[in-house]
Amino acid sequence: MAATWYQVTCDVPAQLAETVADYLADLSGCGVCTENRDVDSFSPDDIPELAISQITCYFSLPCRIEQQLAQITGFLAALPGYIPAAPPRVSLLGEEDWASSWKAHFKPLAIGQRLLITPSWETGRQDEGRAVIVLDPGMAFGTGGHETTRLCLECLEGLLVPPPEQLEQIKILDLGTGSGILAIAAAKLGALQIDAVDIDPQAVIVAEENCALNKVADRISCSTTPLEQLGDGYRIILANILAEELVRMAPGIVSRMAPGGSLILSGILAEREALVRNGFDPFPLSFEASLAAGEWRCLHYRRLP
């Protein structure tokens, strides 16, 4: 089989993964694959393990791979906090190898106790007791691998445990739905009335497609409806967006909560948690919990009667 692609893999500290992935995507003109793992980068026993992300990109032939590697190496060396875990690795792939290689990075992901996110080519896997969400990687709107999404899903799972007849009455809002993953999870966990909104029309199209793929389109309404035009009485509101946006939207979010309802806020860096908590302090809310995953935080509030 004739080689048609160079595969380049870099190991970088997890906190730099997004920066490096964006750079490699721009440089290669193709998508990138990011895989998180723990690697002991040092031999002394008293030095802790570092969280490492393995980022893989692809260059189509013909190309001057030596020049590309020099650019990558120079970019990495200039990053603050970059500690080389291993030099970039290069291999040649044929067309069929490339098609299967990127898929190898994406496997079913179990979240919490009752959810399983799987790409479409892995749908044969069923975990007993888990609701299966089918989402393919590569979309720009989220597939569940990021800490912010996982925290939201774990918190949501803990809330959607009443008897089925009670779940049917729960009205849910997914604010900034992206791929629709949170709304789909809510439907898979038994909710029947879900509004999924996003300011990006393309995100709404993707969310609608994913709802149809997961056979929950009859439970979820996807739209670009602005927050101020939505109704109220939501028992659960999910918002996985930037901390500053959460604070700006706080009055509109809280006013749409039902008394006793839950609010799940994610997309919050640890250093921004105080900003968000201060922004929601003036409202009639009870702070329930702060969940942590790496540098990210997810906050759970309840609306006071």
Curated annotation (Swiss-Prot):
Top EC category: transferase
Highest taxon in the source lineage: Bacteria
SUPFAM superfamilies, alphabetized: S-adenosyl-L-methionine-dependent methyltransferases
A Pfam family matched in the record: PrmA
Documented EC number(s): 2.1.1.-
GO CC terms, sorted: cytoplasm
Catalytic activity: L-lysyl-[protein] + 3 S-adenosyl-L-methionine = N(6),N(6),N(6)-trimethyl-L-lysyl-[protein] + 3 S-adenosyl-L-homocysteine + 3 H(+)
Molecular function via GO: protein-lysine N-methyltransferase activity
Keywords assigned: Cytoplasm, Methyltransferase, S-adenosyl-L-methionine, Transferase
Binding site for S-adenosyl-L-methionine: T149, G176, D198, N240
Main localization of the protein described in the UniProt heading: cytoplasm
InterPro entries named among the record's database cross-references: Ribosomal_L11_MeTrfase_PrmA (IPR050078), Ribosomal_PrmA_MeTrfase (IPR004498), SAM-dependent_MTases_sf (IPR029063)
Protein's cellular compartments: Cytoplasm
Entry's Gene Ontology BP terms: methylation
Tagged with keyword Cytoplasm: yes
UniProt keyword Cytoplasm, yes or no: yes
Stated family: Belongs to the methyltransferase superfamily. PrmA family.
Function per UniProt: Methylates ribosomal protein L11.
HAMAP family assigned: Methyltr_PrmA
Protein name according to UniProt: Ribosomal protein L11 methyltransferase
Source organism: Trichlorobacter lovleyi (strain ATCC BAA-1151 / DSM 17278 / SZ)
Taxonomic lineage from the root: Bacteria, Pseudomonadati, Thermodesulfobacteriota, Desulfuromonadia, Geobacterales
Gene symbol of the encoding locus: prmA
